[in-house]
């Protein structure tokens, strides 16, 4: 329930920045969550969550990582969401709705003991295995914490820059050669 969630317990302990019902659902124009105009519809829920969990939200004030919106948007799920696929996982699909808990809470949908079940929900990955569910979700390819993804990103950045630099050099050399041939032909 909301009262037992990270948001509910934070609000109960006096943290007024914690979201209450109106923070997610709106104050006067509450629409059913399945309708596209709702702030908590699959179409809008990631934007609603990013209000607090994004780079300009209140998350940093409480030591919560603020890259979650960006890493979601760069993930397979986030890219599919940008392409207007509304059946793809969003924040609430994995973290839950009213009963959002810290990852180390045994009742959390993203707890290591529960992640296979979370990924394996009908409509998501029903064949999910522990190996499948062990993959990193919020990956920042610019952070060394991302391990191999970081080094692959660096490799392709250097490869792309090197390829473009090489092409630029060949174009310049070709232009000089053509100019020299044109001068010799006169």
Please report, for each region that a protein language model flagged, where it lies by residue:
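Selective detector of the "anchor" transmembrane alpha-helix that sits immediately C-terminal
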Residues: 151-175
